[in-house]
Amino acid sequence: MATTQQSGFTPAASPLASTIVQTPDDAIVAGFTSIPSQGDNMPAYHARPKQSDGQLPVVIVVQEIFGVHEHIRDICRRLALEGYLAIAPELYFREGDPNDFADIPTLLSGLVAKVPDSQVLADLDHVASWASRNGGDVHRLMITGFCWGWTYHLAVCRA
């Protein structure tokens, strides 16, 4: 299903296509949650199938530089339709909101560069712990990343 909404993208991401694909959610449960991490409550978006037998394989979806916007949330929904528990944590939540930045250079210097690698990696560990407490099988844990998130997907795979 296509919609004309461009919700959740930072102004720095312009121009955007006039339509986006949105996965139907009648067979999944999706929404926002809060994950305890390093003394804070990290916002995250998650999606899972409505019906499942036992624990689900887990996919951590690491955001791009524009944060957890509608496209990243839709990736979680697509993964849920395939039988996964998918989680996209808001990894910038301590430093700021990407929607507050009008261009990419300012977004990079004003937000992205301020997020320490050690903080991101620790947050991702807490996402995995949350998944194990919420129906996920962390022995079948995968991670994918987009743009900025690709770096962290590689770092986690190397650890």
Description of each model-found segment:
Residues 1-159:
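N-terminal cap/leader regions of alpha/beta-hydrolase-fold enzymes
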